[in-house]
Amino acid sequence: MGCKNLLSLGQQMLRRKVVDCSREESRLSRCLNTYDLVALGVGSTLGAGVYVLAGAVARENAGPAIVISFLIAALASVLAGLCYGEFGARVPKTGSAYLYSYVTVGELWAFITGWNLILSYIIGTSSVARAWSATFDELIGKPIGEFSRQHMALNAPGVLAQTPDIFAVIIIIILTGLLTLGVKESAMVNKIFTCINVLVLCFIMVSGFVKGSIENWQLTENKSSPLCGNNDTNVKYGEGGFMPFGFSGVLSGAATCFYAFVGFDCIATTGEEVKNPQKAIPVGIVASLLICFIAYFGVSAALTLMMPYFCLDTDSPLPGAFKYRGWEEAKYAVAVGSLCALSTSPLGSMFPMPRVIYAMAEDGLLFKFLAKINDRTKTPIIATVTSGAIAAVMAFLFELKDLVDLMSIGTLLAYSLVAACVLVLRYQPEQPNLVYQMARTTDELDQVDQNEMVSASESQTGFLPAAEKFSLKTILSPKNMEPSKFSGLIVNISAGLLAVLIITVCIVAVLGREALAEGTLWAVFVMTGSVLLCMLVTGIIWRQPESKTKLSFKVPFVPVLPVLSIFVNIYLMMQLDQGTWVRFAVWMLIAFAIYFGYGVWHSEEASLAAGQAKTPDSNLDQCK
């Protein structure tokens, strides 16, 4: 009996979501277009990083070669963005990576993904709100910070912030109120701030190229101190030239620059609020990443042309660079752009946060009252207010520098799961899920052969076991031209094995870096064997028949691109320190307590599995 109950629980955790086939039906308001999505993605991604991150990475890691660091980071982000784009075309519903995981790899993984997305958005909102407050305080002479230190100091070093940030709380309250008014209104404000930000960045790039000098990309160490006007012995000069810290410095800078592109995934949460989601979401993701890369590339190039990389101020590099060139008045233009960027960033974090909460509550995995929709504004008002309140409390009490890495680990985990979902789903047979049917036209749905549809109850508990026998021939040379249950099972097993192998490669590459450099036998053997097995398993997946489902957008070069995306994301996760992993473990313990205490028993999919599900025939009729 115990084994039977354990098996039943396992099936519950792996059940997959069957989504309503209706294309248009949504409780949310469909009012966003492609331009709105591009503005949302650019506003979320092109935030404080462009005004601060470029200086820190150029000075400490890459020098003028920071432009290559941003290029590598952009390519890594595009890999994840392409995977999000395909799922946006397949499943244009609210929920982003959470929903993508739910319809592909099962309920437990979906809950983990959604829970970490919520964490990322909350921390992103709180940290940028504090940055906005600090920037504004700096601009007016720091009276707010001085008042807080004198009258509101918190005596809990290492636990709470030195002073509470009331202004950050006010910012979050204003943005929360703006989001409760409606999607169209908040999107309009976002577009205005984003346009101002882009114009300021264009001004910075043009000014930098005009006032800059190519000599700053060709410096040697003996030219350093006179150029900076100081004799600081702590300044790192490297070897000079365009790539002063070598290619390893460029890669190290790319790992940091990757986080500058985090934010585009908020586009994928708008599936039920976009007029034409199958086309608008992929275009919005790719276009926003392209615009952000051009901005990061141009600003970092202008910055290192205007001023020697080793002289850059890591906190406020752009005002320092203009001052170095004798144009101190330009700092006001930089301040305007910085405040606009810091205004769109929390809006970009707060916009998807309640929508992920709403999607999880609608599915019964979080408390049901969080799924309430305001009748007038058609927004998830309870989820918006709740998430805003949590973000405000964190911004008020905590120094968030220790939580930034925690935000990154949650985002990278979501990216990895989405890439894995694309890899798995591309090789699965047709199922009655919206995963396939939402991407089709009504005429195409009329032609679906009902005999090819498997039952909804079977599909909920995972991919079905195969009737064929495993053999080298059936694995490497499948008979069918279309995906079957057997080929789908092979891909599932291969994807799981591939994840283990990639994790092994990343652990050895990061933790065994010195052993690899010294040629230690065990490190070389494990690394070589794991890489070869990764190539073999990827080849096995490539040999399986691929789904011919027509979509408005598909990731090219599958399975190679999703595998590369998973590798990059896991490698960056392994770069995070031990404290981050401990905090991540605590966050996950809270997640498991909620899921096993509430979610697994109140899941809507559990109700369907218990007998309330519609028959495959009725699901098909609904699509016609």
Swiss-Prot record:
According to its record, how does it sit in the membrane? Multi-pass membrane protein
Extract the Pfam families matched here: AA_permease_2, AA_permease_C
- Where in or outside the cell is it found? Cell membrane
GO annotation terms (biological process): amino acid import across plasma membrane; basic amino acid transport; L-amino acid transport; L-arginine import across plasma membrane; L-arginine transmembrane transport; L-histidine import across plasma membrane; L-ornithine transmembrane transport; lysine transport
Q: Where are the transmembrane segments?
A: 36-57, 62-82, 103-123, 163-183, 192-212, 242-262, 283-302, 333-353, 380-400, 404-424, 488-508, 522-546, 555-575, 580-600
Molecular function per GO: amino acid transmembrane transporter activity; basic amino acid transmembrane transporter activity; L-arginine transmembrane transporter activity; L-histidine transmembrane transporter activity; L-lysine transmembrane transporter activity; L-ornithine transmembrane transporter activity; virus receptor activity
Q: Name one GO cellular component term.
A: plasma membrane
Q: What does this protein do?
A: High-affinity, low capacity permease involved in the transport of the cationic amino acids (arginine, lysine and ornithine) in non-hepatic tissues. (Microbial infection) Acts as a receptor for the ecotropic murine retroviral leukemia virus.
Subunit info here reads: Interacts with TM4SF5; the interaction is negatively regulated by arginine. Forms tissue-specific complexes with ASL, ASS1 and nitric oxide synthase NOS1 or NOS3; the complex regulates cell-autonomous L-arginine synthesis and citrulline recycling while channeling extracellular L-arginine to nitric oxide synthesis pathway.
Q: What is this protein called?
A: High affinity cationic amino acid transporter 1
State the organism named in the record. Rattus norvegicus
